[in-house]
């Protein structure tokens, strides 16, 4: 079991076969989720409930909410607004948000603003045989919407992503058991052959405790890092030049 503040060396990166990626604050700005996605869902909710409150296709999302919210539209709306305001990460809210974002992505109103280094690096790693997997507190359907509608060219990165994990099929991201659960799905790959990239130091520590290599990703708008997570082998500001599997991508500026 690795230390929560263990460093990741160039040799460690060269041995990596799987990159596990967080989303918010790692591949796209935190502000996209808080300032674009969350408000969009709240704005779309009343119109959606006008049309869908009693419809069979909306029933799974509505019935996933606890009572009395599931039976009362005013309570439902108030509960959603409260959860969003407090940034509570519960699976039934995440599923509803993904449902509400679908129309926005499909209409082109929403495009995920990936950092410039993300798409070129992910494609370079994929071309080098590195498996790419997503792990986010957002639901798997919402993850696929985001990576299917980005500002990159081509806009969809779904074809190069091998698997998707959220708090439902893996567990909470700050618990080492969640990373152990993900590892168990890939018994032919050793923990030390995984690299988890996230802006959250507690998630990074949990992944390291499960035996993965992990780096804190420092992006504009992210919270300042604790001193123990600052330094070479602890944090990165860009995926560019990160020689995962011995493959270094330095093309993001020209892509």
UniProtKB/Swiss-Prot annotation:
Catalytic activity: 5-methylsulfanyl-2,3-dioxopentyl phosphate + H2O = 1,2-dihydroxy-5-(methylsulfanyl)pent-1-en-3-one + phosphate
GO biological process, one term: L-methionine salvage from methylthioadenosine
InterPro entries, per database record: Enolase-ppase_E1, ENOPH1_eukaryotes, HAD-like_sf, HAD_sf
Protein location: Cytoplasm; Nucleus
Cofactor binding mode and count: Binds 1 Mg(2+) ion per subunit.
Residues where substrate binds: 136-137, 173
Keyword Amino-acid biosynthesis: yes
One Pfam family it belongs to: Hydrolase
Pathway the protein contributes to: Amino-acid biosynthesis; L-methionine biosynthesis via salvage pathway; L-methionine from S-methyl-5-thio-alpha-D-ribose 1-phosphate: step 3/6; Amino-acid biosynthesis; L-methionine biosynthesis via salvage pathway; L-methionine from S-methyl-5-thio-alpha-D-ribose 1-phosphate: step 4/6
Top-level division of the source organism's lineage: Eukaryota
An annotated GO cellular component: nucleus
Binding site for Mg(2+): 22, 24, 199
Catalytic class of the enzyme: hydrolase
Keywords: Amino-acid biosynthesis, Cytoplasm, Hydrolase, Magnesium, Metal-binding, Methionine biosynthesis, Nucleus
EC number, as in UniProt: 3.1.3.77
NCBIfam families associated with the record: enolase-ppase
Sequence similarity: Belongs to the HAD-like hydrolase superfamily. MasA/MtnC family.
UniProt-recorded name of the protein: Enolase-phosphatase E1
Native source species: Verticillium alfalfae (strain VaMs.102 / ATCC MYA-4576 / FGSC 10136) (Verticillium wilt of alfalfa)
Gene that encodes the chain: UTR4
């Amino acid at each position: 079991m690795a230390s929560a503040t263990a460093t990741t060396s160039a040799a460690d990166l060269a041995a990596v076969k799987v990159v596990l990626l967080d989303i918010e604050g790692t591949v796209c700005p935190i502000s996209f989720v808080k300032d674009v996605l969350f408000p969009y869902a709240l704005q779309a909710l009343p119109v959606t409930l006008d049309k869908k409150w009693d419809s069979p296709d909306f029933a799974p999302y509505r019935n996933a909410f606890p009572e009395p919210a599931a039976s009362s539209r005013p309570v439902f709306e108030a509960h959603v607004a409260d959860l969003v305001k407090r940034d509570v990460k519960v699976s039934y809210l995440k599923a509803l948000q993904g449902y509400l974002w679908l129309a926005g992505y499909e209409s082109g109103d929403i495009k995920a603003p990936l950092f410039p280094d993300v798409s070129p690096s992910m494609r370079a790693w994929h071309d080098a045989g590195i498996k790419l997997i997503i792990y986010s507190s957002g639901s798997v359907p919402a993850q696929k919407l985001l990576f299917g509608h980005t500002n990159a060219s081509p806009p969809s990165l779904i074809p190069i992503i091998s698997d998707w994990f959220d708090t439902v099929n893996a567990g909470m991201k700050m618990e080492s058991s969640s990373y152990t659960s993900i590892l168990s799905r890939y018994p032919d790959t050793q923990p030390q052959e995984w690299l988890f990239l996230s802006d959250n130091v507690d998630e990074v520590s949990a992944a390291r405790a499960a035996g993965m290599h992990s780096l804190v990703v420092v992006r504009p708008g992210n919270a300042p890092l604790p001193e123990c997570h600052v330094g070479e082998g602890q944090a990165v500001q860009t995926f560019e030049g990160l020689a995962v599997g011995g493959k270094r991508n330095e093309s993001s500026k020209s892509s």
